[in-house]
Amino acid sequence: MNGAKKNNSQRLQILTQEEIAELYGAPQFNLMERSHYFLLPEKVLHSLKIMKTNGRNTSARLWFILQYGYFKAKHQFFNISYGDAKEDVTFIMAHYLPNDPLPNQLPSRRIQGKLKSQILQWMEYSDDMSRADQLVAEKVRHFASITHGLTEIFSEVINYLESKKIVLPGYARLQDVIG
């Protein structure tokens, strides 16, 4: 991580573009990682009620498994199309939905919201951003008395949020709270 500096929008630039992409970008799994991250616990698999063919529910089930695996890996949700995650989608379809055609579109935003809530429950995480802001502000005050290194503070904040099982806030939000 580099030293912090102000960019044109007056936000502190704490991370490089590469570091931001690594932290906030969707995972890029190899085959072994797919086998691990898309492996669903029996209780989660049972709750999905996957049938021999799933009709209109195929997209919701596919999206759930995709986001479940990504969340398991990075504790965040991703706005990603099936085309952008082609290898992961192919893997999921082959392992969980082999008799269904690939859906043409993602589930509706309303259904995505419900599925995100289910994933958060299964993983015992919270996406309460006002609580995250409060915790981050407390941690920043604490670490600012120990160090002036913004990248070190940023790393500690991320570790702290993960230990509290809170979804990682967006980079701009963390920049604003840390800055």
Model-derived features: positions:
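Long amphipathic alpha-helical coiled-coil/heptad-repeat bundle
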Residues: 2-179
